[in-house]
């Protein structure tokens, strides 16, 4: 058996097309264009690439895109003032603060400064709390995108044993809550987990988001399991690889996401989807 690929690029392109169509309809109805402000502090190369992709996505679907590229020495006070201005700007539906930030800045305080109804990344404690209470509003983009990928497989998630490898605030923890909402029995593993291979081997669904290349071995995967690899790691030869050993997981899994071209495109598409939702529902 060889796993079927979950094509994140194709699914994300379809979602962007739907969003672009809705933006065009809004214009025809005389409604304003959804607006996204993206703040980049410093010159981290990976962040610059991510931000350029997000701005290109905005142009593709017809969003208003405002870019704020700030020097690495930008102060906490200056960033707070900028966020406050964007919070009060009626043309802006979403405010995105690109992480990581320079060490002298308090990311938690800045993320909490973004108004919850403009927190299109879904990182604000209010939005995470809504998800935990089973009444999600703006959902964290990567877990939300993964749920869309899972829907594309047609798999019935109810009653599945799901394992989330990695307990980060951005992916692991909200992912576990999304899977609980979908009816899975969820185990979250982390750096103190004693028998990672055993947990993975019992799982019908594995979501790996640890940022460690090759952490999950293909032979650990249960026959026919769904494997979602969130990791994206650049090797010395420049090749991008995930947290799962893809070549050995492929013959065992039922469905698997490639790296690149799996989860990443969906994260970006869900950022657009959240921004459109904010414009149409929260700022109507």
From Swiss-Prot:
Residues binding NADP(+)? 166-168, 232
Give the E.C. number(s). 1.5.1.5, 3.5.4.9
What Pfam families would the database entry show? THF_DHG_CYH, THF_DHG_CYH_C
Q: Does the keyword Cytoplasm apply?
A: no
Q: For this protein, what is any one GO molecular function term?
A: methylenetetrahydrofolate dehydrogenase (NADP+) activity
InterPro entries xrefs? Aminoacid_DH-like_N_sf (IPR046346), NAD(P)-bd_dom_sf (IPR036291), THF_DH/CycHdrlase (IPR000672), THF_DH/CycHdrlase_cat_dom (IPR020630), THF_DH/CycHdrlase_NAD-bd_dom (IPR020631)
Would you name any one GO CC term?
cytosol
UniProt keywords, alphabetically: Amino-acid biosynthesis, Histidine biosynthesis, Hydrolase, Methionine biosynthesis, Multifunctional enzyme, NADP, One-carbon metabolism, Oxidoreductase, Purine biosynthesis
Reaction(s) catalysed by this chain's protein:
(6R)-5,10-methylene-5,6,7,8-tetrahydrofolate + NADP(+) = (6R)-5,10-methenyltetrahydrofolate + NADPH; (6R)-5,10-methenyltetrahydrofolate + H2O = (6R)-10-formyltetrahydrofolate + H(+)
**CDD domains xrefs:** NAD_bind_m-THF_DH_Cyclohyd
Question: Where does the chain cross the membrane?
Answer: none
From the UniProt record, give one GO term of the biological process aspect. Answer: purine nucleotide biosynthetic process
Q: List the disulfide bonds.
A: none
Quote the pathway field.
One-carbon metabolism; tetrahydrofolate interconversion
Which family is this protein grouped under?
A: Belongs to the tetrahydrofolate dehydrogenase/cyclohydrolase family.
What biological function has been recorded for the protein in this entry? Catalyzes the oxidation of 5,10-methylenetetrahydrofolate to 5,10-methenyltetrahydrofolate and then the hydrolysis of 5,10-methenyltetrahydrofolate to 10-formyltetrahydrofolate.
Q: What PANTHER family does its record include? A: C-1-TETRAHYDROFOLATE SYNTHASE, CYTOPLASMIC (PTHR48099:SF5), C-1-TETRAHYDROFOLATE SYNTHASE, CYTOPLASMIC-RELATED (PTHR48099)
Subunit: Homodimer.
The name this protein goes by in its record: Bifunctional protein FolD
Query: Which source organism does the UniProt entry give?
Result: Pseudomonas fluorescens (strain Pf0-1)
- Source species taxonomy: Bacteria, Pseudomonadati, Pseudomonadota, Gammaproteobacteria, Pseudomonadales
